[in-house]
Amino acid sequence: MKFPKKIKMSGFEINLVLLDHEISYEVSEQQGSFVSKPPLTIYLDKKIIERGDRTSLNVLIHEVLHFVYYQYQLNLTKQLDDESKEEKEVNSIANGVIEMLLDTDLKEWILKTIREIK
């Protein structure tokens, strides 16, 4: 299964760009990065994603969750009381994860990767 070049979530198109390891990690010291200004883009360490293992899934899901945080404006939950804040944040994250798993072009890649993890 080929890794998609873009996904659509919540009506937004998000570019998925695989970067050479030297650029991703050695230069910027990160395995992935979400850019919230248009065009929305998630940069991922190509070497890590191509391994197709637990770390690959973790990095991918981590960066998609940055989009969820941005899209559902979770930075604004500071104004809510603790119980309301927690419920809004957890519900938003759950909605974003379900959308990523069921409604994006990442679904097949994620399922294949999960099946192949030993």
Predicted regions and their residues:
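Active-site recognition of the HExxH zinc-binding catalytic motif
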Residues: 58-70
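Metalloprotease/metallohydrolase-associated module, dominated by Zn2+-dependent proteases
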Residues: 1-54, 71-118
